[in-house]
């Protein structure tokens, strides 16, 4: 645990040395918060983790979209090492055939997901902007309740909807979450990369 804390401190010092004073303060504060969460064994907010991983990826317009997807896959897997114990970490790939399906998916795809009916109804409600907090209480598993919290934040994302990606990002996140958080980040992030 000390080793992770020392790595986090070293990385924050390295990253903040090249930034302006305001950026350095924000980055340092954010890294200290993540290090504190890791040191205490508290799981960081998955929505913030998703945003952090996505925002730290630099799309290279000199390369093809396919090459950028591979770089994104590698980036996500490297970043996940900061959020999961190394003993449980395993490299996860984007299945390109599944990504093509998700790029074409609409709300009918939600029925194919392996969640309880209450969770599927909540996903429909989030996408339709009809979600309310009472719906979460109907969901019996903690992992699916956590998914709803993340999806609500992801769908709202400060702008009230996910229309930029025609709800495909939210559907991709829900699909990936069936398997792991890493898969959710990979597929939802890959959908976001389409806009670049």
PLM regions: where:
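Bacterial Sec-dependent N-terminal signal peptides
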Residues: 1-29, 195-196
